[in-house]
Amino acid sequence: MEPNTVIPKYNVRGFEIWGFRDMAQVLDHLLGSGPVKTGTLVAMNAEKLLKAEDDTALCELIKNAEYLYADGISMVRAIRRKYPQAELSRVAGADLWEALMQRAGQQGTPVFLVGGKPDVLAETEAKLRAQWNVNLVGSQDGYFTPEQREALFARIAASGAAIVTVAMGSPKQEIFMRDCRKFYPDALYMGVGGTYDVFTGHVKRAPKIWQNMGLEWLYRLLAQPSRIRRQLKLLKFVGYYYSGRL
């Protein structure tokens, strides 16, 4: 990234979205020269924005995160409509996580994984080590009790992890990251949803051509027709888009 480059932020419905130009700019900003940036990464799309508007606690969690990025094509298009001069690209959460892991492997950055089923987590660890030689300093599957949370926070802190990725779904992962950061603020936290499942092949992602056309949502809908109710809720965001209420 060029020296002194200022990355713009764009306000959509009260949420400040970072306007990353491309994946390289994200990586250079977070893992460039010097220590890994600390803070929380949250993927933003239309569905999450609408959820946050209906859930005060989730809204506060998201707004307190340092790095909100445009994960969905809906968010990118909304920003471009409101800010015609904006130069930003979609940064898919699954792609960002893989890119972070690859860069972490190259730099020897310590990583701690949280969430997922035990077998999926084990496969994720094995693949990360084999593919990018990632320095994994600890892990915990998603099956732990509320009483075990503080012990897990202590393990994460003791590991010295610089990156902590949490696959628990929203809003559980945002709550976990907030609470863990109070105990151990010296890391970059990233909520990754079902990314471990995709990475290990347990869940099939849309082909690249669908992704590049911004139609990943349609691919998922065709694969899982039960998602139709979730998609219909997005009509509210379409209303924001066309009525100038972004």
Curated annotation (Swiss-Prot):
<comment type="similarity">
    <text>Belongs to the glycosyltransferase 26 family.</text>
</comment>
<comment type="function">
    <text>Catalyzes the synthesis of Und-PP-GlcNAc-ManNAcA (Lipid II), the second lipid-linked intermediate involved in enterobacterial common antigen (ECA) synthesis.</text>
</comment>
<dbReference type="InterPro" id="IPR004629">
    <property type="entry name" value="WecG_TagA_CpsF"/>
</dbReference>
<keyword id="KW-0328">Glycosyltransferase</keyword>
<dbReference type="InterPro" id="IPR023085">
    <property type="entry name" value="UDP-ManNAcA_Trfase_WecG"/>
</dbReference>
<dbReference type="GO" id="GO:0047241">
    <property type="term" value="F:lipopolysaccharide N-acetylmannosaminouronosyltransferase activity"/>
</dbReference>
<dbReference type="GO" id="GO:0009246">
    <property type="term" value="P:enterobacterial common antigen biosynthetic process"/>
</dbReference>
<keyword id="KW-0808">Transferase</keyword>
<protein>
    <recommendedName>
        <fullName>UDP-N-acetyl-D-mannosaminuronic acid transferase</fullName>
        <ecNumber>2.4.1.180</ecNumber>
    </recommendedName>
</protein>
<comment type="pathway">
    <text>Bacterial outer membrane biogenesis; enterobacterial common antigen biosynthesis.</text>
</comment>
<dbReference type="Pfam" id="PF03808">
    <property type="entry name" value="Glyco_tran_WecG"/>
</dbReference>
